[in-house]
From Swiss-Prot:
Localization per record: Secreted
Organism, scientific name: Centruroides elegans (Bark scorpion)
Record has Aminoacyl-tRNA synthetase as a keyword: no
Protein name from the UniProt record: Potassium channel toxin gamma-KTx 4.8
SUPFAM superfamilies attached to this UniProt entry: Scorpion toxin-like (SSF57095)
InterPro entries (alphabetical): Ergtoxin, Scorpion_toxin-like_sf
């Protein structure tokens, strides 16, 4: 689910949010991106 994406997904310094994005999409959200090195899902 969404919360596990935040914990699991590593967010790099320069927008490497692919892992976060994939995780969020699997959780049923539109996309994911990184804010202060944390994965955030966009519903």
């Amino acid at each position: 689910d969404r919360d596990s994406c935040v914990d699991k997904s590593k967010c790099g310094k320069y927008g490497y949010y692919h892992q976060c994005d994939e995780c969020c999409k699997k959780a049923g959200d539109r996309a994911g991106n990184c804010v202060y090195y944390k994965c955030k899902c966009n519903p």
